[in-house]
């Protein structure tokens, strides 16, 4: 039964969007910035006023489409007109609900999601959620211990499929020199995919197999995964062990002909043409702590590999965004001074520099981090990627559920526009309306093309068991967990 996959709700919903950057596995949560405090205060002010006017509690208001609109109005009040949101929408529940309903069927493939294995010991993910409560930024978590259960399959299923407009997801993972610290084994990811798709009667979940070049027996593990698990694509981390960087003994380069090219040959032969590679998320403090891995975190090895293997697609996760963990201000300062952002600009320039058309940018934490911390930086990076890679080479991914239910990111993307001054100065194209061609490509059409998710499969999603169960779930009222 579908209900068996839904956990009991354990916390109330504090606000429509997060008002502070919170960690994934990459960094500890930074303190709120002055502007983030201003946004939070403005959201609370609007929430109090509009909730009273509509005759509901502020908490109830924040669970509505009008509450979501109010949050982006507050963002615009602080950061300037970056998001498409109006006070009229926030004041009129019918108008907000009509917009939300019209967009709810939008085809969204989130090809960058996570949950943790049942026997995980990675308590750092729990500590990151608790830190938010201790800091007082998220009332729902204040004084309430978080548990690893919040990061396991049942809550993943709920937050991805019921608390957001996501239609299809890909379960990713991360390997480690320490076997116990793999987020999920490759077998576990394949089992989750089979479980969900059998339950729903459609293809709602895809899965990665993680490859770890240089590890003993790694190519044999690739052969086994191809033969037995049939992953939808492979994913690797060029820094090696990203979870325990202090243990990383096998960093690698994408253009290492001796080490990687035999792997690419296996993928091409098997028809698994999508190679997903984690890049970036290597801020200045991490660089100082682990300098030996720094040269593996950027994108200097992408161009040659892409040129040498035109039959493969290289999808760079997080679009190589460097400035995580409260360092978004450094990224914005760099952009304002130079027009560049490490290492997103470098990635966006690869097609022109190398004459290739097989390099893609996954959003992941590039969007989750910058949307809340520095919206103008977010707009700038989206402009770079769409201009350099092409709108048909940028793919949606949220890194959920480290970031809670991804609906707030979906709404941010729907409403985001590159400011006119930025468009004129840098030649960035406009992103256009929520359901316009550019955002449709990014949300789902590009990944559908990459993974051959055809019209028949898309049609099945409208009448499968999730579609039916979600209709009942929404009638009972939303219970999103839009954490950051």
Predicted regions mapped to residue ranges:
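Catalytic pocket-lining loop regions of alpha/beta-barrel enzymes
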Residues: 248-396, 421-431, 475-484
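Mid-to-C-terminal alpha-helical segments outside catalytic/metal-binding sites
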Residues: 56-73, 94-98, 107, 123, ...
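Acidic (Asp/Glu)-rich catalytic clusters
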Residues: 158-165, 186-202, 222-231, 266-270, ...
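N-terminal secretory signal peptides
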Residues: 1-56
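Divalent metal-dependent hydrolysis catalytic cores, especially in the metallo-beta-lactamase
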Residues: 130-149, 155-181, 204-210, 232-233, ...
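C-terminal segment of N-terminal export signals and the immediately downstream linker at the start
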Residues: 48-56, 76-113
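Active-site gating/metal-coordination segments in enzymes
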Residues: 175-297
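Hydrophobic faces of well-ordered beta-strands that scaffold small-molecule active sites
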Residues: 109-113, 169-171, 206-209, 234-235, ...
